[in-house]
Amino acid sequence: MFFEQLPQQLVNGIILGSIYALLALGYTMVYGIIKLINFAHGDIYMMGAFVGYYAINSLKMNFWIALVFSMIVCAILGAVIEFLAYRPLRNSTRISALITAIGVSFFLEYIMVYFVGADTRSFPQSIKMYTYHFGSISVTNVQLLILVVALVLMVALQLIVKKTKMGKAMRAVSVDSDAAELMGINVNNTISFTFALGSSLAGAAGVLIGLYYNSIEPLMGMTPGIKAFVAAVLGGIGIIPGAALGGFVIGILETLSTAIGLSSYRDAIVYGVLIVILLLRPAGILGKNVKEKV
């Protein structure tokens, strides 16, 4: 029975994993450039879902315009959070920045609870759903859309990082921010751009997950945010392809856990696999062990 369901569950896992991958990319970019775990990232994903919800429901935008609008709003939100919450603490201890990140996370969650309530809302289905059958595998047009959008955004991110002037600045700052500043790179602008870029991907993921599961609520970012962080660590935090790979691995693990009747333990299985991977490869699947000079 399990092997009959395996192809379908792999497809479902890849779709879910593509959303985790988008989220994980935000974590890994921010960590790569300033060594900060931005635990508010999952809540930016939640904000993206709500921006998409109101853009479609209240502003009567179509799905594609709402998706871009959500990405823009979340990019601005990410840059503002970096400027107000993280920049003043850049020379402080890492624990100070970590506590601030957790505080920003709770602030975003409960300000949304205050303004929109804690109830779950149905995300508007602005795209008519069709199902395609390929042998024993069933795939909807919405699933295909999610996968294609996620892959396009991942490729676009890679092109930005590798081919653009700002991308080169990001890589320079991640290696040595002091040397980058001496070379004329505006470190503050580069870090703000990194937050904005990662947050825009989180906003896109929020809209896609709303379309996929047809429901959103103010606390929806907590668990996916942690899983995306796990995905980033699993693949090798600070490494963009590693974060994407980790996202797909987490998505497939979750759906396979459900397929074998262990849906109640799927989170435990994900974290268990993370522990095993880190025991075997402490830097993650694609990470490299680097000795830190003291």
Per-range role (PLM):
Residues 20-22, 60-72, 192-202, 206-274:
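Transmembrane alpha-helical segments in multi-pass inner-membrane proteins
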Residues 49-53, 71-77, 104-111, 149-158, ...:
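Hydrophobic core segments of alpha-helical transmembrane domains in multi-pass membrane transport
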Residues 11, 33-80, 84, 260:
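Membrane-embedded helix boundary and interhelical linker motif in transport proteins
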Residues 89-163, 190, 256, 261, ...:
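Transmembrane helix-bundle core of multi-pass membrane transporters
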Residues 36-39, 74, 136, 171, ...:
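Glycine-rich phosphate-binding loops of nucleotide-dependent enzymes
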Residues 60-104, 111, 245-250, 281-282:
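Alpha-helical transmembrane segments within multi-pass membrane transporters and channels
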Residues 16, 138-216, 240-246:
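Helix-loop-helix "hairpin" substructures at the membrane interface of multi-pass membrane proteins
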Residues 1-23, 51, 59-66, 92-96, ...:
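Membrane-interfacial amphipathic/re-entrant helices at transmembrane-helix boundaries
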